[in-house]
Amino acid sequence: MSSSGQTQFRYTQTPSKVVHLRNLPWECVEEELIDLCKRFGKIVNTKSNVGANRNQAFVEFADLNQAISMVSYYASSSEPAQIRGKTVYIQYSNRHEIVNNQSPGDVPGNVLLVTFEGVESHEVSIDVIHLVFSAFGFVHKIATFEKAAGFQALVQFTDVETASAARSALDGRSIPRYLLSAHVGSCSLRMSYSAHTDLNIKFQSHRSRDYTNPYLPVNQTAMDGSMQPALGADGKKVESQSNVLLGLIENMQYAVTVDVLHTVFSAYGTVQKIAIFEKNGSTQALIQYSDIPTAAMAKEALEGHCIYDGGYCKLRLSYSRHTDLNVKAFSDKSRDYTLPDLSLLVAQKGPAVSGSAPPAGWQNPQAQSQYSGYGGSPYMYPSSDPNGASPSGQPPYYG
């Protein structure tokens, strides 16, 4: 709409004590709205973060003439209304007062519904969520899932007071950068109260956790059937887990061999088989573990990790449909670590890199993690220790 058209529209509207503001900057807060409007009169109510993009707001003045004064001023001014340097469009609202009816999400409860904005589900682990919210009190349970609104979580506290304190402190804030991987941008938190009062967690997994019951079995199933959001009740397909990971290797500036992959992935458990192949012009690999929990832990830790310093050879991981790989026991592109005679095959095959034999313990996943480089390339380990120490004892590099 042209400037003249907007001016005409303002004057053809029926004046109201409530002013409608559009095109607000991201995360515009009530104080910024009041600061813009207060010189025109007394403000009695506000309602912000409305609209599909949450970039609109309503401001109610005590007197109709005060609202008219504001709309008329900016309709004739050569300087548009601005908040944080962004032009804000102002017009009369169709409503004559702001009624803040409480939606179900506004009724206080002990369970918070948290939306993580700006990230994918694999970029914020359940351990990070627990760390952030446990600062306000004991967290009983957490369930994560994906909806149309994005990656979300239900966080259960002991009581309403604790949940309210967490919401007041964290709503609209961002998770500290040091808790996120280097490639992840800002992660903002949006919160409302959930209608749930006690989450039904059947298994411990990377998608759900019950901190009140340490004896709950570990299972790849994300949630009990009664927790519909965690099972993708909105129809969105939930990724099926597997003991075999499919890895896409991006930005390959250095060679990635079977031994290099074994070094990386064996830090999280015994690797049974590895196969490297080319598909659609990119290098991919299949890594087989003995069970799903080990594969899930490796996937969570290594997704987005760069094998080499400088952001090279970044891993993008998903679960494979395979459960048992059929690979050649020993080749340049595959390895079967379940064979008892593997060391003999290595000896027959001869030197692996730069004229030197592979490290004596390379077929042993635990021994493999004792050397920190491969062929002189700047490989950096991901952290497998909760305190941030790498398997080699050197500071980890998070790519």
From Swiss-Prot:
Residue ranges constituting the RRM domain according to the UniProt record: 17-95, 109-196, 242-322
Gene responsible for this protein: PTB
UniProt-recorded Gene Ontology molecular function terms: mRNA binding
Xref: Pfam families: RRM_1, RRM_5, RRM_8
Protein name: Polypyrimidine tract-binding protein homolog 1
Function as written in the Swiss-Prot or TrEMBL entry: Plays a role in pre-mRNA splicing. Binds to the polypyrimidine tract of introns. May promote the binding of U2 snRNP to pre-mRNA.
SMART domains per record: RRM (SM00360)
Top-rank taxon: Eukaryota
CDD domains per the UniProt record, alphabetical: RRM1_PTBPH1_PTBPH2, RRM2_PTBPH1_PTBPH2, RRM3_PTBPH1_PTBPH2
Chain ranges passing through the membrane: none
Cell inner membrane listed as a keyword: no
SUPFAM superfamilies xref list: RNA-binding domain, RBD
Sequence segments annotated as region (Disordered): 352-399
Disulfide bonds: none
Keyword annotations from UniProtKB, A to Z: Acetylation, mRNA processing, mRNA splicing, Nucleus, Repeat, RNA-binding
GO biological process, one term: regulation of translation
Biased composition (Low complexity): 365-384
Location(s) in or outside the cell: Nucleus
GO cellular component: cytoplasm; nucleus; P-body
Modified-residue entries (N-acetylserine), positions: 2
Cross-referenced InterPro entries: Nucleotide-bd_a/b_plait_sf, PTBP1-like_RRM2, PTBPH1/PTBPH2_RRM1, PTBPH1/PTBPH2_RRM2, PTBPH1/PTBPH2_RRM3, RBD_domain_sf, RRM_dom
